Regions:
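Short, well-ordered beta-strand elements
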Residues: 173, 182-200
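Hydrophobic aliphatic residue packing
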Residues: 48-49, 195-196, 214
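Short, gly/Ser/Thr-rich active-site loops of penicillin-recognizing serine hydrolases
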Residues: 166, 198-226
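Short acidic, gly/pro-rich beta-turn/loop elements at beta-sheet edges
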Residues: 54, 170, 194, 205-206
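A short local loop/turn or secondary-structure capping micro-motif enriched for an aromatic residue
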Residues: 108-109, 179-181, 202-205
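Short, surface-exposed loop or secondary-structure junction motifs
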Residues: 1-178
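Solvent-exposed loop/linker segments at secondary-structure transitions
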Residues: 160, 180, 192, 217
Length: 226
């Protein structure tokens, strides 16, 4: 939500009630029958975790995921706490002007609310790579990590895009919020990967170009298509 606008509750967002600015989240097809990008689906999962854990979502994620991985400069708190704002990048529009009022507030924390750094996001990537090998399972077991990286409908696993070849698979994801665009790509078996974050609308094109250059210079597998 833009700065200065009323912030809806999670239930209001799910039901599409004012002051939410999105349609209600509704089942469109039987689960598993087809794939569709769904921030609403992650919002349902956010409410589910709150209901089951009886904790605030940001605290649950800090204790269950961020802290065990070592992502000390990351949080799902929305809006960003005052004491952390001095270290946050200013978001910019595509025309080079700052986003009015600063960063938006995203009560849809699971889908859009993570504040992080490239280094912390790289720790997330490395944890997946190491967890898959059984070297570090701070959050997921080897079997759960393998399940996370299996494709279902389309080319998505559980939260990540899966690409590459059977010999050298990789996982990737982009991220776009108002004034922030980012990309990550990492190979499951070789330990290679990169995270590029930008603070401008349209920055994902730059992030993807930087990752392609890294892939080419360092000779990643499938570097022509990464």
């Amino acid at each position: 939500m833009p700065a200065g606008t009323p912030i809806p509750t999670l239930v209001q967002i799910l039901n599409g009630e004012q002051p939410a600015n999105t349609a209600p989240v509704r089942l469109e097809a039987p689960p598993g029958s087809r794939w569709k990008h769904s921030g609403g689906g992650y919002t349902v999962m956010q409410q589910l975790l709150i209901d089951v854990s009886h904790e605030q979502f940001a605290k649950f994620m800090r204790d269950a995921v961020l802290a065990p991985i070592g992502m000390a400069r990351s949080t799902y708190e929305q809006p960003l706490p005052v004491e952390l704002r001095a270290g946050a990048a200013t978001p910019y529009n595509a025309d080079g002007t700052p986003v009015a009022g600063g960063p938006h507030t995203y009560p849809e924390m699971a889908a859009a609310g993570l504040w992080t750094t490239p280094t912390d996001l790289a720790r997330y990537v490395i944890e997946i790579q190491r967890s898959l090998r059984g070297d570090a399972n701070h959050v997921l077991s080897v079997e759960m990590t393998k399940q996370m990286l299996l494709t279902g409908q389309g080319n998505y696993g559980l939260g990540l895009v899966i690409g590459g070849s059977p010999e050298n698979p990789y996982f990737s994801h982009g991220g776009i919020n108002a004034g922030f665009e980012n990309s990550l790509v990492a190979y499951q078996r070789t330990g290679q990967g990169a995270v590029v974050m930008t603070n401008t609308q349209g920055g994902q094109q730059l992030a993807d170009a930087v990752i392609r250059s890294i892939a080419s210079v360092y000779g990643w597998p499938n570097s022509s298509s990464s």
